[in-house]
């Protein structure tokens, strides 16, 4: 499930690249670029069908990119949930907290954990594993997300960033275990961090074309819905931000297919 880690674990190269914008591209910031982002507060859920009552959504659109953003939890509730996550989530240790790149082992620049329904399996750094059973705080978040979106989720990947030096490199959530066409719900608690989308055709030193980067600051208690076909056309990352000193916990809720035996 974390095949993307291979690209992000080579010394300090990733950090240097993530702190720079590609030459000739102007980043589109949420609410700033009229063509790449559109602020449309609505009382409806993103995805399949509407919801009679719920938060106001900002819809982010670009070529092949379809996302919806809202602040799902007020500060007091978000603070409470964040403290529960800090106490209750059990993160990977040992070999599961490292990744092998070209025969060498590297520490993952963040903490990770997975929880989900019984019977599920997933691929993580070349290993096929089963998630831990749901705990109350995760069920609380999952059920609230489902209530406002109309979507169901059976798995969550949790990433904890101790400060702005922890990061994740450019990747796409395109693992074979994901239900085709299903959205991914990204919920954030703690420090606000920039979330960066880059089109697959505009990556590298010699991109085939120029497509504006889309950057979204993900606030404490926020929800970002990444709808199909976003992960087909766009890579995303959480770049290094050295001025950020506080921790952040991000949960990406997914719908995983049950492996046939």
From Swiss-Prot:
UniProt binding sites for Fe cation: 171, 173, 236
GO BP term, example: DNA alkylation repair
Presence of the UniProt keyword Iron in the record: yes
Subunit structure: Interacts with PCNA homotrimer; this interaction is enhanced during the S-phase of the cell cycle. Interacts with nucleolar proteins NCL, UBTF and NPM1. Interacts with XRCC5-XRCC6 heterodimer.
Protein name as it appears in the record: DNA oxidative demethylase ALKBH2
Designated gene of the protein: ALKBH2
Cofactor annotation comment: Binds 1 Fe(2+) ion per subunit.
Effect of residue 101 to G: Loss of activity toward N1-methyladenine adduct in either ssDNA or dsDNA
Reported function: Dioxygenase that repairs alkylated nucleic acid bases by direct reversal oxidative dealkylation. Can process both double-stranded (ds) and single-stranded (ss) DNA substrates, with a strong preference for dsDNA. Uses molecular oxygen, 2-oxoglutarate and iron as cofactors to oxidize the alkyl groups that are subsequently released as aldehydes, regenerating the undamaged bases. Probes the base pair stability, locates a weakened base pair and flips the damaged base to accommodate the lesion in its active site for efficient catalysis.
């Amino acid at each position: 499930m974390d095949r993307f880690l291979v690209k992000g674990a080579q010394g300090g190269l990733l950090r240097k690249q993530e702190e720079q914008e590609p030459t000739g591209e102007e980043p589109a910031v949420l609410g700033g670029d009229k063509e790449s982002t559109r602020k449309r507060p609505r009382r409806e859920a993103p995805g399949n069908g509407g919801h009679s009552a719920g938060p106001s959504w900002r819809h982010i659109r670009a070529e092949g990119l379809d996302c919806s953003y809202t602040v799902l939890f007020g500060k007091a509730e978000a603070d409470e949930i964040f403290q529960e996550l800090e106490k209750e989530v059990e993160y990977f240790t040992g070999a599961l907290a490292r990744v092998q790149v070209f025969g060498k082992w590297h520490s993952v620049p963040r903490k990770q954990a997975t929880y989900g329904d019984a019977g599920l399996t997933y691929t993580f750094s070349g290993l096929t594993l089963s998630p831990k059973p749901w705990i109350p705080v995760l069920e609380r978040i999952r059920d609230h997300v489902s209530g406002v979106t109309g979507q169901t989720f059976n798995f969550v990947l949790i990433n904890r960033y101790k400060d702005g030096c922890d990061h994740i490199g450019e990747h796409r959530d395109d693992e074979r275990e994901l239900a085709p066409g299903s959205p991914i719900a990204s919920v954030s608690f703690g420090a606000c961090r920039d979330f960066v989308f880059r089109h697959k055709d505009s990556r590298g030193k010699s991109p085939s074309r120029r497509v504006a980067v889309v950057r979204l600051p993900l606030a404490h208690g926020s929800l970002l819905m990444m709808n199909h076909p976003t992960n087909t056309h766009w890579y995303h990352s959480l770049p290094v931000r050295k001025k950020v000193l506080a921790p952040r916990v991000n949960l990406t809720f997914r719908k995983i297919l049950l492996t046939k035996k």
